[in-house]
UniProtKB/Swiss-Prot annotation:
Function of the molecule: Ceramide-binding protein that may transfer ceramides from the endoplasmic reticulum membrane to the cis-Golgi network membrane, and is thereby required for the biosynthesis of complex sphingolipids.
Protein's membrane topology: Peripheral membrane protein
One GO CC term, this protein: cytoplasm
Listed name of the protein: Ceramide-binding protein SVF1
Region called Peripherally associates with membranes, residue ranges: 1-18
Keywords: Cytoplasm, Endoplasmic reticulum, Golgi apparatus, Lipid transport, Membrane, Nucleus, Transport
Compartments where located: Golgi apparatus, cis-Golgi network membrane; Endoplasmic reticulum membrane; Cytoplasm; Nucleus
Record Pfam families: Svf1 (PF08622), Svf1_C (PF17187)
Family classification: Belongs to the SVF1 family.
PANTHER family assigned: CERAMIDE-BINDING PROTEIN SVF1-RELATED (PTHR47107:SF1), SVF1-LIKE PROTEIN YDR222W-RELATED (PTHR47107)
Amino acid sequence: MLKWIQGGISSVTGIAEPEYGPEFIHSATERVRGKQPFHETSRQDLAWRNISSTHVETATFYFTQIQTGMAGFAQIIYSKIGGLPRTAQFTFRLHHASRPELGTWTSTKLENFRVEGANFYADNLSLELDSTATSYTLQSSVTADSVVDITFKRLTPGVKVGEDPTTYYGDNTKEPWGTMRHVFWPRNSVNGTVVVHGEMITLKNDYSVMILALQGMKPHHAAKAWNFLNFHSETHSVLLMEFTTPKSYANTKVSIGILCDKDSVLSVTIDNEVEHVKPKTDEVGWPVPKALSMKFTGIPSSVPDKEVASAEKLSARVDIELKNLVERVDVMAEIPAFVKNIVSGVVGTKPYIYQYANEALLTYAGSEYKGFAWSEVTFISEFEN
């Protein structure tokens, strides 16, 4: 059980946490250092955690149509804050490079929701994992502004970092006061339709990433910044999920990279470098980059633990000119009230998500691959050394 009170008075008041130090964060990536990071997901890994303590749990399905530059995501948010009743939300984002009038953002409260293993149901919405645990079908008509009927079929194995893909906060991993957990389907085909602005858009053998996440603590206490990449080409997919903790947890970086070819996971990397190229402070006060350069270093996914030390390194790089900003999301203006209440009024906390959709270049094994990337740069709280 999560015990926020163990995190000190800050968990109750929202004030800055004391400096606990690096020994108070136990990351999933550090547990696999010197071992094979890649572990394949099981059906149980895909089940909603549905824990009783305070948390925010999400299932996010990103989609990319390389030829048209259409990209976006559908997301279910399932949350419990303190002693309040559980709440659920469906959010949907669509960006279309050649037809900007189709751009859509919806956020809709869900009613009469429930979870059943990996499945989620609400009035006018269903998310179901098939019996073979190789495809999800998402159907939603909770709002006429984004009607969704799409199926995501796994093209590669699912990915988790280690047997337990959870990062724990606190001095006792058996009774942590905070957690962060991610599991991934890094390369999927997506088929179906979405209706926006009264127009039906067809997805046919396009590409997708699926991410299940659980955050079991206040977002501004868990991380001060995030970097995210969802890159697809016809032959490869690259995913990055990276966050940096606040000073209270020693500015610790937890970075997960996944490199795939058409049908396999080539490497899961935990030693990644993200360069924010030519950052410039914008009107809200954050140093926004003009480009991103992401370097991934790891070992082949087939290497067993006993051979990791002697294994030949594998590396890749993704470069993106951030020419197209889809949205600068003022999180405090967009998030549901139940989440806003836990971050409002915190000094130095001004969360913004910068969402981009751009062409990108993957460099791997001496070759270059052009593709399309949905990337996000998130700033949550002031940077301190």
